[in-house]
């Protein structure tokens, strides 16, 4: 679609909206020609009081229009956000004007639907709720603002209210210098068909694992020195991947020992290890986790259908998940998470129902329902694998929510990813008391996350504001291992951020 901007250059927000509203269109900025089938002209002007935007939208012979005005108040930074919002809202209103005019056949061919999340394009649909509650609004006022300001339907707004309220409760438990810790293990037994993460297949890169673990431990120890000297307090720890389960018991023990020796964990009630694929789980590894006081383990089958596991490149069967969960239960960890993905190749609504029912039967108290995200580097896209359509994914999710509620689960966090099937969300469900606070903290951007390991993204949050900065570790295990100076630079930036924006009082 050709985009023409007059009086502004809000490319990013319009491109994000375009991705949601017109999933098959790519943005271009060439001059509009009379024969063009898809184009939109967005014109903005302003007075001292407000920003006024108009949209003219042409799509395969159909035309639509929209207008929107947003007050301009507050700081220059706040006014920039108000301008972006006005442009995005105007584009969305033009789409709403266009949609009912289009024949059903054209909608189907172009994969056009009314977005279930309204005009929200970000990965954190409930963040406006948390922010509104922080400002003193009632839950009903916060939900109504989501519906009127972002055009979110009632059902999705109610879900966002539930998870956003948990985010607000998480915020109240945090103090100014509280942080979370993350350790990444970027290795997997094999690469799944849906995955584009920078992770190494162990069968191809086994020799990298041991030097990686040594470099990781060195980073953890230097990070511990930094955290102690700056009087920061860890509140949650999460080891993810990749698949941490590829580590040997000795390697797991060494990493967790370094964590305990480097950080004061007396105020850290949550220690999570996403051990991952069930075929990597052994009694010896679970014994190590138990000895280090791990409070939550994550077993991630993604599906309990064997033919779906084969289709996505997993080399385990559903029986391996059953065996792994029996082992996990024997060690009596306080909390157990399981992950499922709706929309996998070869899956059906009936198969997804069987998978969810089996996870509930196996005793998880925390179940995350992901929706398949079509990532650019994944085998699904590169090989054109067939996946369930949006209606099938909707049927899967329509079964999940009431089934989990009936089993005593409530939603406690949600987030979106780009290129996600049907513009749905990932939702974390838990029984009361089973929430993973690290997940809430990172999805709601409530506190800084200090990340260790290759590809780690350290997020620095100024409490009580929207000011967030990031530094990134080197992506690949080999370059991470060979270039420790990058770690030193990132830790120096972390210290500088806290000295500048979160000084000790």
Protein language model regions, located:
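A contiguous binding-surface segment within folded domains or other stable secondary-structure elements
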Residues: 398-414
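Conserved non-cysteine loop/helix-boundary elements of the Radical SAM core domain that shape
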Residues: 199-399
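Canonical Radical SAM [4Fe-4S] cluster-binding loop centered on the CxxxCxxC motif
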Residues: 178-213
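Radical SAM enzyme core and accessory elements
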Residues: 1-139, 216, 432-505
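Flexible glycine/acidic-rich beta-alpha junction loops that bind and position SAM and/or redox cofactors
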Residues: 307, 311-312, 342-349, 364-390, ...
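Amphipathic, soluble alpha/beta structural segments
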Residues: 232, 237-241, 422-426, 490-505
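Short beta-strand motif preference
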Residues: 53-55, 183, 299
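N-terminal [4Fe-4S]-dependent radical SAM core
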Residues: 99-104, 108-113, 134-181, 230
């Amino acid at each position: 679609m050709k985009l023409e901007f007059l009086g502004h250059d809000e490319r990013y927000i319009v491109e994000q909206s375009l991705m949601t509203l017109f999933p098959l269109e790519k943005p271009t900025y060439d001059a509009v020609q009379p024969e063009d089938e898809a184009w939109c002209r967005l014109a903005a002007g302003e007075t001292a009081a407000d920003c006024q935007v108009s949209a003219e939208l042409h799509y395969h012979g159909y035309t639509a229009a929209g207008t929107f005005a947003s007050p301009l108040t507050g700081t220059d930074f706040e006014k920039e956000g108000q301008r972006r919002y006005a442009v995005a809202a105007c584009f969305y209103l033009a789409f709403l004007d266009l949609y009912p005019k289009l024949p059903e056949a054209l909608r189907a061919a172009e994969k056009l639907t009314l977005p279930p999340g309204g005009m929200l394009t970000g990965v954190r649909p409930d963040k406006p709720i948390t922010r509104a509650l922080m400002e003193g609004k009632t839950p009903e006022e916060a939900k109504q603002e989501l519906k009127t300001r972002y055009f979110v339907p009632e059902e999705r707004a109610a879900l966002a209210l539930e998870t956003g309220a948990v985010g607000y409760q998480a915020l109240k438990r945090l103090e100014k210098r509280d942080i979370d810790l993350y350790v990444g293990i970027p290795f997997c037994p094999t690469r799944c068909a849906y995955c584009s993460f920078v992770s190494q297949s162990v069968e191809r890169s086994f020799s990298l694992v041991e030097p990686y673990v040594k470099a990781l431990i060195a980073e953890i120890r230097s990070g511990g020195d930094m955290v102690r000297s700056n009087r920061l307090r860890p509140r949650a720890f999460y080891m993810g991947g990749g698949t941490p389960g590829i580590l040997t018991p000795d390697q797991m023990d060494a990493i967790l020992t370094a964590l305990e020796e480097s950080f004061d964990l007396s105020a850290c009630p949550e220690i999570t290890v996403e051990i991952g694929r069930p075929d990597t789980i052994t009694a010896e590894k679970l014994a190590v986790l138990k000895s280090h006081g791990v409070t939550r383990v994550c077993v991630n089958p993604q599906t309990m259908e064997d033919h779906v596991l084969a289709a996505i490149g997993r080399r385990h069967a559903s029986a391996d998940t059953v065996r792994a969960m029996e082992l996990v239960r024997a060690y009596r960890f306080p909390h157990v998470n399981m992950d499922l993905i709706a929309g996998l190749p070869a899956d059906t609504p009936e198969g997804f129902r069987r998978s969810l029912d089996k996870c509930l039967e196996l005793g998880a108290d925390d179940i995350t329902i992901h929706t398949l995200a079509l990532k650019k580097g994944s085998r699904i896209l590169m090989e054109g694998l067939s996946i369930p359509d949006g209606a099938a994914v909707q049927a899967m999710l329509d079964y999940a929510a009431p089934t989990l509620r009936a089993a005593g689960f409530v939603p406690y966090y949600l987030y979106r990813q780009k290129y996600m099937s049907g513009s749905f969300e990932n939702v974390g469900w838990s029984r009361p008391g089973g929430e993973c606070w690290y997940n809430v903290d990172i999805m709601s951007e409530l506190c800084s996350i200090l990340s260790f390991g290759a590809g780690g993204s350290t997020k620095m949050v100024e409490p009580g504001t929207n000011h967030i900065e990031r530094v990134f570790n080197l992506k690949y295990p080999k370059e991470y291992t060979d270039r420790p100076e990058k770690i030193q630079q990132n830790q120096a930036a972390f210290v500088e951020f806290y000295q500048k924006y979160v000084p000790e009082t």
